[in-house]
Amino acid sequence: MSSATVAASRRQSCYLCDLPRMPWAMIWDFTEPVCRGCVNYEGADRIEFVIETARHLKRAHGFQEGRSPGPSPSSSSSSSSSSSVKPQLSAKEMAQIGHTMGGPEGVTRTSQQPPPPQCLDRYSLERPPPPRLGSEYGVGRQVNGILLPNGFPKPEEPPELNRQSPNPRRTSSVPQSLGALMNGAPIGSGRTPVGLSAASLVAAAAATTSADLSGKRPGSVSSSEHDGKEKHRADSYSELGENHKSRAEEWISKPKTVRDTLMAMQHSHSPFDSKFKKDPGPGRVLSFEANNPASKSGARGGRKRKPSPEPEGEGGSVKMNGEGQPWLPAAESLKISTMASPSFISPPSTVSPHSNRTTPPEAAQNGQSPMAALILVADNAGGNHASKDANQVHSTTRRNSSSPPSPSSMNQRRMAPRDVPSQIPSGGTSSHAGMEQGHPQSIPDSSIPNSIPLCCTLCHERLEDTHFVQCPSVPSHKFCFPCSRQSIKQQGSSGEVYCPSGEKCPLVGSNVPWAFMQGEIATILAGDVKVKKERDS
């Protein structure tokens, strides 16, 4: 015997993928011998269910299980004792079962090697059909003993050579759903949709392949028959899609928590048509928009102020509520509705405040890439965190501004004046909202770029952008380092040193005045010492 035949005789077939595997690649811990690849693919916790489903489908198709060579003598006893227990099947094997059903797959192996001993309760003892003549072979290929579209085997290559062949039509590289469509697998070849049990899958499989159950499958399937099956399958998928849409309409009347749970379940088990279409169905987006009170109130809150003087009818926030956006694709609507959740209500900042609101939607849509949307959401999150307290609308972003800020803190400071008014409806104070809406540019704040230059409260000299002392209680109290040093020396650095303005500014939320910490005093005074040393030298 050749070395290839010897190697092939040592291999055992996996119950799920039917590929010849070496003994060390097989796992005997489950109800059927399966290879490590299938266990890793499905997960050890799901593999029993998959084996069970495979067994049901094989029985429903009248599938002869005589293809797999038996296990090695050392493990045959364990396999025969476990064969009476039930096993399972994966999404990827359903596609293979549809076209290998009744097919003469045993030809390849039995033509090259004598059949190994088989367990009587699992494997039939019928003789394989004789090899086909060369004139009968078509364009179909057989990879690892698995028949591809037209069902012809190609026995001139040993299985282990086929395993390594760089065949582009290898079943592992074909999408599972497409393989199922080509090869005549039942509709349930993806993960089981909601509401479909294994029993109903078996019934559907038996119905769709009843033409093939009368003995062996013919050598070739006519193209008209194939097209008819394809149409039948497409109709079934469209019916599934219609069921999901009607379900989504029924959910509108349910409570919000129930509706959200149902939505999440539907998205995680979406059928073929919603998985492979480019745009998600707009019905779900609009029902989400229409039933989200937070997004409505957010859009109303955002509509109170406008950073640019366009008339109300052209504002971007009006179009965000789902009524006035016929031109907006469903994917963009989904993106906007995500960003309109209560913690990120900032409609005007989704488009640049200086851009022309009357431009066609393509311009705004192309300008907003998914990455830009992610960055924007991250910036908004930072801004919300920084201005959590309604009474310190701006001071929180400046509390640590005596040290050079990181780029993320600069982003927070830049976003703050735009974010704060849009958060007011969810629990801020109306006085700050009125101040922000009436004079959005009048605050002497470092967070507004290109605005009024920062000046020291005492000497009115212009301050550097990051190198000054900021009172944490009063936003307008900003001091240069020379004035701060002078104030510390006047108050005496040994005791409590309060705000350089001369007032005892209370901490936010209490009557206790804030005072410099010793480390801060040392830092401010240290600059003075360094300057003197430089002058002396």
Curated annotation (Swiss-Prot):
Residues 162-176, 335-366, 389-400, 423-432 have a biased composition (Polar residues). Keywords: Metal-binding, Nucleus, Repressor, Transcription, Transcription regulation, Zinc, Zinc-finger. It is found in: Nucleus. Its main location: nucleus. Residues 60-186, 208-366, 382-446 are annotated as: Disordered. Belongs to the IRF2BP family. This is Interferon regulatory factor 2-binding protein 2. It comes from Xenopus tropicalis. The lineage of its organism: Eukaryota, Metazoa, Chordata, Craniata, Vertebrata.
